[in-house]
């Protein structure tokens, strides 16, 4: 990072909690957040079932809050000289360690709640159509979960950013391409396979 790459600040921050916080801020903030976001985005396509939106939102809030509460105090401790890999520390760092510990528990609960909600929805979640998010890109035109060959008929290619090209089909309970909304031009409908 910028602080650890500059000699004037790295001399002070080297081998402190700042290094620990920076590493975990990048890895948890970038990797874990992307993993959870990708799982929630693709879950309906993978399983053909929708996750519990409330559990997803609560899990997201807890992960975000716990993540910042865990690692932000470590930046402060490191900038104040708290070395890493020490079992004991000065009393001035006690409150920061306590907040960081509370944040770790909140983060863990958020991750656990998110995964429990996803696993539960894979078996008990409400069935969803092939396009529950009104997405205009090609992958959302195949069934959820996708068939072995993905498409039975030639898919309609639209601009992936033209969200007005999608209309809601109440019979299928999903969004479909506007071109398929007209029965004269639509291919035969195929109901999603039961699980």
Annotate the PLM regions.
Residues 1-19, 35-59, 73-95, 116-135:
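Juxtamembrane membrane-water interface segments of multi-pass membrane proteins
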Residues 22-24, 195:
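Histidine-centered active-site/metal-ligand motif
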Residues 24, 65, 75, 115:
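Divalent metal-coordination and catalytic microenvironments
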Residues 25-32, 97-111:
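Hydrophobic alpha-helical transmembrane segments
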Residues 28-33, 59-72:
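Hydrophobic membrane-spanning alpha-helices of multi-pass integral membrane proteins
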Residues 83-92, 121-195:
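Extramembrane terminal tails and long inter-domain/linker segments of multi-pass membrane proteins
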């Amino acid at each position: 990072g910028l602080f650890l790459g500059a000699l004037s600040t790295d001399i002070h921050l080297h081998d402190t909690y700042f290094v620990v916080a920076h590493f975990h801020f990048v890895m948890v903030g970038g990797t874990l957040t992307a993993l959870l976001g990708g799982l929630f985005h693709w879950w309906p396509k993978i399983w053909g079932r929708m996750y519990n939106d409330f559990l997803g939102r609560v899990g997201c809030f807890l992960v975000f809050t716990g993540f910042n509460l865990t690692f932000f105090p470590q930046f402060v401790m490191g900038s104040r000289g708290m070395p890493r890999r020490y079992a004991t520390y000065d009393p001035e760092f006690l409150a920061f360690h306590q907040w960081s510990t509370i944040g770790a528990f909140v983060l863990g609960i958020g991750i656990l709640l998110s995964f429990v909600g996803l696993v539960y929805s894979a078996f008990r979640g409400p069935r969803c159509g092939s396009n529950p998010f009104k997405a205009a890109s090609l992958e959302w035109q195949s069934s959820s979960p996708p068939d072995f060959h993905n498409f039975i008929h030639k898919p309609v290619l639209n601009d992936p950013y033209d969200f007005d090209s999608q209309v809601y089909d109440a019979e299928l309970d999903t969004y479909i391409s506007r071109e398929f909304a007209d029965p004269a031009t639509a291919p035969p409908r195929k109901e999603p396979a039961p699980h």
